Amino acid sequence: MALTIVGCAGSFPGPASPASCYLLSAEQRGRRWQVLLDLGGGALGALQRHTDPMGLDAILLSHLHPDHCLDLTGLHVMRTHHPEKAAQGRLDVFAPEGAAERIGRAHGVERTETVEDTYRFHALRDRGSVTVGPFGVTAYAVRHPVAAFGFRIRCGDATLAYTGDTDTCAALRPLMSGADLVLADSAFVGARDTARGIHLTGRRAAEAAVHAGGVRRLMLTHVPSWNDPEVCRAEAAEVWPGIVELAQPDQRVLLSSP
């Protein structure tokens, strides 16, 4: 399983990165499968450096804040009006309840416009599982001001845990346990951001990974441009026993178990 960091800026696109978007790819029986985790503001442009968006097999939306879903409007335009490539049926989108209406509101101007001619929406459920080609996905409801999910993705012998946006919660333990890579929200800085129930800090992300047990790698993401990523890394390093990685736009990571 390959993970490509398309966008990793927190809360809004930054000067060097779009908002949240992560591309998973893997081969199965001679066919390349591609799944997106989130498609936030600015990410559709960057995605085209890595793959043809017309060839996606599914999109998983962690939640419906714009920095995680807004570019579905642009992808709808691409899939509807591309002069040379016809969309091959509707694209499966696994998302919290209400996603079709949410994206339709963003797409329309004077009124909500349907996007269900291009997308087939499936409502996520806590601990619910879906399979897309070689990817087995389990969704975990996490702690954020709106309905939000983390995803545990298994492909062959590799496991990725993506927290989406969350604060510390009980679901992080089964989400992260034994993962080859934890891709963790680190939007808050511990010494400054005292609000709870919204985001992890670097330290809280590391604490969750240690508590889960068996995590091989920890990568921090979703860092807003007003934060210094090295501060987030330093907070996590106080707890995490290994190297604390920082997600970088256009980075490609190959995942496999030892």
Annotated model-derived regions:
Residues 168-257:
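Cap/insert and terminal regions of metallo-dependent hydrolase folds
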Residues 51-54, 89, 117, 133-135, ...:
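Structured loop/turn residues at beta-strand edges in well-structured enzyme cores
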Residues 1-51, 148-164, 181:
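Conserved beta-strand hairpin/beta-sheet module of binuclear metal-dependent hydrolase folds
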Residues 47, 72-75, 103-106, 172, ...:
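Hydrophobic packing residues within well-ordered alpha-helices of enzyme cores
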